[in-house]
Amino acid sequence: MAEAEDSPGEQEATSSKPLFAGLSDVSISQDIPIEGEITIPSGTRAQECDSSTLNESIRRTIMRDLKAVGRKFMHVLYPRKSNTLLRDWDLWGPLILCVSLALMLQKSSVEGKRDGGSPEFAEVFVIIWFGAVTITLNSKLLGGNISFFQSLCVLGYCVLPLNIAMLICRLLLLAGQGPINFMIRLFVVLVMFAWSVIASTAFLADCQPPNRKALAVYPVFLFYFVVSWMILTFTP
């Protein structure tokens, strides 16, 4: 004979029983170990060791920084829209360019006393860095999405064409002064001035709101114009 079906009372009691009621009787042994080791693949470990600079030699660190500066120089000499100069910013290159330009614009102490119109080292240094800071603050006030040091990096590296112009002018002045010499120096300075402006705007223009790009580029134009004027009016 088939088993009798459960009474409605028994079914109701079974359905009202909690789902996890039996888990209260389950106990976990205290002897189960909960220790373990986390293994790192050898390839990942090697990459971390390569990326770490704590154990590298001073010579290797200097060479790595010089190579990075050289790559940024190439970005300025061949300006194109790229985020490399903004992403991997540094101030070593701008410092080197600023010091070298100030040294080339400085006369000897005897000539400086005789001709008071020549800019001194400190004057050139202050003009370049004060101008770069002013342009950076103007960019931030206009709503630019570039950091303070990124802007200083771009403006400093883009002085490179003017450094080349100053070097060429110094070499031309060794042949003496004259109208032809001045016209050649004027042409060189104008070309390098345009190069600096184009290179800097290629990196900074996209960091400004579309309706305020002209307001952000105008101070850059004035900044490099002042530096170019100091180069053009320099006489040994």
Swiss-Prot record:
It is found in: Golgi apparatus membrane. GO terms for biological process: endoplasmic reticulum to Golgi vesicle-mediated transport; intestinal epithelial cell development. The modification Phosphoserine is found at residue 7. InterPro entries: Yip1/4-like (IPR045231), Yip1_dom (IPR006977). Residues 106-116, 169-185, 235-236 are lumenal. GO terms for cellular component: cis-Golgi network; COPII-coated ER to Golgi transport vesicle; endoplasmic reticulum; Golgi medial cisterna; Golgi membrane; Golgi trans cisterna; trans-Golgi network. Keywords: Acetylation, Golgi apparatus, Membrane, Phosphoprotein, Transmembrane, Transmembrane helix. GO terms for molecular function: identical protein binding. The chain crosses the membrane at residues 85-105, 117-137, 148-168, 186-206, 214-234. It comes from the Eukaryota. The modification N-acetylalanine is found at residue 2. Residues 2-84, 138-147, 207-213 are cytoplasmic. Predominantly interacts with YIPF1 or YIPF2, but may also form a ternary complex with YIPF1 and YIPF2. This interaction may stabilize YIPF1 and YIPF2. This is Protein YIPF6. It comes from Rattus norvegicus (Rat). The gene is Yipf6.
